[in-house]
């Protein structure tokens, strides 16, 4: 199955638009795992097992693994998700952006080393920086468009021919870049008006939406702005609020409770 097919199936099977971000901060891991060998993998595995029936995707953030020299644990984690929970796509949050052979090697890293189902990329260097990823026809390429951080406005709201830059990115994705149907866009939950504008531009293209939970994005506004006609179309990401619901031995159960509550809140507004 392609990434988009897996995602659509997971939306239906788990009745969920929730994506759980896997951002394992060693300073916040449960006390029972502190200092243990393979702690990052063990922590993420427990979170995955506790939430896999509640999500449409998992999104490991590559920097949290690389900074701890835990690339092997990231490989192990993605393999584990595919083996233990088949059909749940894994988005490698790498935000890569380069050209030529460097981009080719970043694509190799994402799709042949880590075997991710999709990867996040930056469009700043243009379409040729994305082409190596699109050469993998069964994988997804999720392009930064309107990010959830306040500083994103410094660039993304620059006016070009009377339009903010983020809108031009969305238009380029719709009109020129997404010819193979592999592409999605990142649009932050902290900016629901922009979510609505991007949805208007790109039709049913999947949107990865960070910014709920710890970043304070409003779920109702996010869902109503970004849902497609069938009540899907989004991967609404929550990381810290779920991962660090508890540092005690009940951390996985606590994470599940927060994930369940988040999914239920999202679903309350999907068809309303």
Curated annotation (Swiss-Prot):
Keyword list, A-Z: Decarboxylase, Lyase, Pyrimidine biosynthesis
Name of the featured protein: Orotidine 5'-phosphate decarboxylase
GO MF annotations, alphabetized: orotidine-5'-phosphate decarboxylase activity
This protein's encoding gene: pyrF
EC numbers, comma separated: 4.1.1.23
NCBIfam families reported for this sequence: pyrF_sub2 (TIGR02127)
SMART domains in the record: OMPdecase
Organism expressing this protein natively: Cupriavidus necator (strain ATCC 17699 / DSM 428 / KCTC 22496 / NCIMB 10442 / H16 / Stanier 337) (Ralstonia eutropha)
PANTHER family xref list: OROTIDINE 5'-PHOSPHATE DECARBOXYLASE (PTHR43375:SF1)
Residue numbers annotated as active site: 95 (proton donor)
Gene3D superfamilies xrefs: Aldolase class I
Family recorded in the similarity comment: Belongs to the OMP decarboxylase family. Type 2 subfamily.
């Amino acid at each position: 199955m392609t990434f988009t097919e897996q995602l659509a199936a997971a939306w239906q099977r788990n009745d969920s638009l929730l994506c759980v971000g896997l951002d394992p901060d060693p300073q916040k891991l449960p006390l029972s795992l502190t200092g243990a060998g393979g702690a990052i993998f063990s922590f993420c595995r427990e979170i995955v097992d506790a939430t896999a029936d509640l999500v449409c995707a998992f999104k490991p953030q590559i920097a949290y693994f690389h900074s701890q020299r835990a690339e092997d644990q990231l490989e192990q984690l993605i393999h584990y998700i595919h083996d233990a929970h088949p059909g749940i796509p894994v988005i490698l949050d790498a935000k890569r952006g380069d050209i030529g052979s460097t981009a080719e090697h970043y694509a190799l890293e994402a799709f042949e080393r880590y075997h991710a189902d999709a990867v996040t990329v930056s469009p700043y260097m243009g379409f040729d920086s994305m082409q190596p990823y699109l050469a993998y026809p069964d994988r997804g390429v999720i392009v930064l468009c309107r990010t959830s951080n306040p500083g994103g406005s410094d660039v993304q709201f620059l006016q070009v021919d009377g339009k903010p830059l983020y809108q031009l990115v969305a238009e380029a994705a719709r009109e020129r870049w997404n010819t193979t149907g592999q592409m999605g866009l990142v649009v932050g939950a902290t900016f629901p008006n922009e979510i609505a504008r991007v949805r208007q531009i790109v039709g049913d293209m999947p949107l990865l939406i960070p910014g709920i939970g710890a970043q304070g994005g409003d779920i109702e506004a996010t869902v109503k702005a970004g849902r497609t006609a069938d009540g899907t179309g989004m991967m609404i990401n929550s990381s810290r609020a779920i991962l660090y619901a508890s540092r005690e031995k009940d951390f996985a159960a606590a994470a599940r409770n927060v994930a369940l509550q988040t999914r239920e809140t999202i679903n309350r507004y999907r068809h309303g």
